[in-house]
Amino acid sequence: MKKLIIRKTEEIENWRKDIDSEINFIPTMGNLHDGHIKLISTAKNDNSNINLVSIFINPLQFDNKLDLENYPKTIDNDINISFSNGADAIFIPSNEDIYPPNNNISFLKAPIELSSALCGLNRIGHFDGVCTVVYRLLNLIKPKNLYLGEKDWQQLLILKNLVLRKKLNIAIKSIPTQRDFDGIPLSSRNVHLSKNERKLISFFSRELLEAKKNFQKEKKINLKEIIKKLSEKKISIEYLEHLHPYTLQKAKIEDNISLLAGAIRCGETRLIDHVFLMKRRPIIAIDGPAGSGKSTVTKLIAKKLKLLYLDTGAMYRALSWLIIKENIDFKKENKLQNILKDISIVFKSNTSSHQDVYVNNYCVTEEIRSQKISSIVSKISSIKEVREFLVEEQRKIGESGGLVAEGRDIGTTVFPHAELKIFLTASIDERAKRRKSDKNSKDLQEIDLHKLKELIKQRDSEDSNRKISPLIKANDAIEIITDGYSINEVVDKIIDLYNDKIPKESEIK
């Protein structure tokens, strides 16, 4: 495709009609740096869409005329950087194109619950200007994907809200904050810093990063101590806050993930920085009935996100297998207590990059998927002592997070504070077809489809009506009905939800 520079709104509209491709859109205000390069190259590598970079210095985002006049303008270099790193087209409109004097442009208001904190405290109207220009650009360009940096976290939240509020069919893709050699977040305004000012900014960023490191050990933050250290360096602090990362309200002690964000001034330059604090790595809880695709989907998600795969259903099946093998009357509490005391259930990766299940050092991966086990596992899993024992084992595995677990009570009982909860389901017909074609359930392949539907209905009834941890959708779970969707489509949907819930830069290293 020929590289193209577009300067008029009429041209962008005509170009949009002529192209036969979706658009990845990377909005910028010019003076491009490595952070912008990361956005452009990420868009290029993500898919085969056309990549459009816009360069527009939005006057509505500046606190005063002098700030606008002093903003670096490096258009020729910006064009070279954009095209060199994957842009197919560049949109460079004028003020008159974006804000035509005789046209009724929608001047938007940012949501007050997100714009009144942090930068919004002193930059009145700034985020209104952000919403106005981005909404104008999105309406002109109509992209499939919008690429934004997490460096401007508050702005990212507000633009996500804008896309949701205006019901725009646009996916927002974010990239982590990109830092320079001395730890400072890359910013177009860094060129204004003197050597001494840069040292102060670097000290500020290092303090935030050190606070993140300490939080991983101590699970608490001391704002007063950080402010004291900054004040001793004569750093002018505009704000330093510990907040919930999505509501921007004061962080609560029970929050697993929180935001430590600050803004300082050095000379005439104002800079922002933040870090995410996590008590443990994220957890994804996937619940749903038999045959809904939980196992297949969960395994793929674990692989793609590099998370531990915890198959809690396999743990109940493994215990059921041992009960049958040892011919134990599980209705007798003393017999059950003995087996719970001595059982060892271990997951091991095999040479096929799959997970094998071992009971007391014996591999039972295939045996626990038999219909014989399926017919008894719901009864055994409804026993109070069994559930208490295995739930405790599962929680031990999840103490440090970093896992995706599937079962029937993950989001309600095992990990009620999971960052993302999914309730995966499908129609009885669809689930019966899947179970019958499941190569790991050989005995199910020989059962009549009608009979299999009845077995699934029976299992659903047992799971949903048991007194302890019944199969129910958690209040904050997102339901996904998988009829008509491929496995990969479901996986991609859940990963998108995960990326929307978990900042990319928040992962504990």
Swiss-Prot record:
Binding site for beta-alanine: 61
Signal peptide start-end: none
CDD domains: CMPK (cd02020)
Residues that hold ATP according to the record: 29-36, 149-152, 186-189
An annotated Gene Ontology molecular function: pantoate-beta-alanine ligase activity
GO cellular component: cytosol
Xref: InterPro entries: Cytidylate_kin, Cytidylate_kinase_dom, P-loop_NTPase, Pantoate_ligase, Pantoate_ligase/cytidylate_kin, Pantoate_ligase_C, Rossmann-like_a/b/a_fold
Catalytic site: 36 (proton donor)
Gene Ontology biological process terms, A to Z: nucleobase-containing small molecule interconversion; pantothenate biosynthetic process; pyrimidine nucleotide metabolic process
Region annotation Pantoate--beta-alanine ligase: where it falls in the sequence: 1-275
Catalytic activity entry: (R)-pantoate + beta-alanine + ATP = (R)-pantothenate + AMP + diphosphate + H(+); CMP + ATP = CDP + ADP; dCMP + ATP = dCDP + ADP
Pathway involvement of the protein, from the record: Cofactor biosynthesis; (R)-pantothenate biosynthesis; (R)-pantothenate from (R)-pantoate and beta-alanine: step 1/1
Function description: Catalyzes the condensation of pantoate with beta-alanine in an ATP-dependent reaction via a pantoyl-adenylate intermediate. Catalyzes the transfer of a phosphate group from ATP to either CMP or dCMP to form CDP or dCDP and ADP, respectively.
Similarity comment: family membership: In the N-terminal section; belongs to the pantothenate synthetase family.
Record's protein name: Bifunctional pantoate ligase/cytidylate kinase
